[in-house]
Amino acid sequence: MATRILRTFDELKSNSQTGLITYLTAGFPNQDLCLDIINELSKSGSDLIEIGMPFSDPMAEGPIIQQSSKIALDNGHTMELTFDLIKKFRTKNSQTPI
């Protein structure tokens, strides 16, 4: 069985299209708004949504992602909450690759 990501790339390729891949930090600016943003990204045409896990020492990331990680962690975001966020998204959208 092909994954959602592979199916999306195959479909884009077969239609000679490029895809829109969006990124956000889980839990930023807070859990509820993050879920709203993910839903809107999907509705607005994002072909794939990358959700970054906030990390306390994101040295490989640029300043914007570092700051969003800090804010998410300062608000109490955890890895478990990231998985909860994705589960909530999946209850309404089973197709958009994450």
Predicted regions and their residues:
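N-terminal amphipathic alpha-helix/helix-capping segment at the start of soluble metabolic enzymes
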Residues: 1-21, 86, 91
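A conditional alpha-helix N-cap/helix-loop micro-motif detector
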Residues: 2, 31, 79-82
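Active-site mouth loops of central-metabolism enzymes
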Residues: 20-34
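Hydrophobic faces of well-ordered beta-strands that scaffold small-molecule active sites
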Residues: 20-24, 49-51, 98
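Glycine-rich, proline-tolerant flexible connector loops at the mouths of alpha/beta enzymes
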Residues: 28-31, 44-77
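Non-catalytic positions within long, well-ordered alpha-helices that form the structural scaffold/packing
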Residues: 39-42
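Alpha-helix-loop-beta-strand connector modules within alpha/beta enzyme cores
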Residues: 62-98
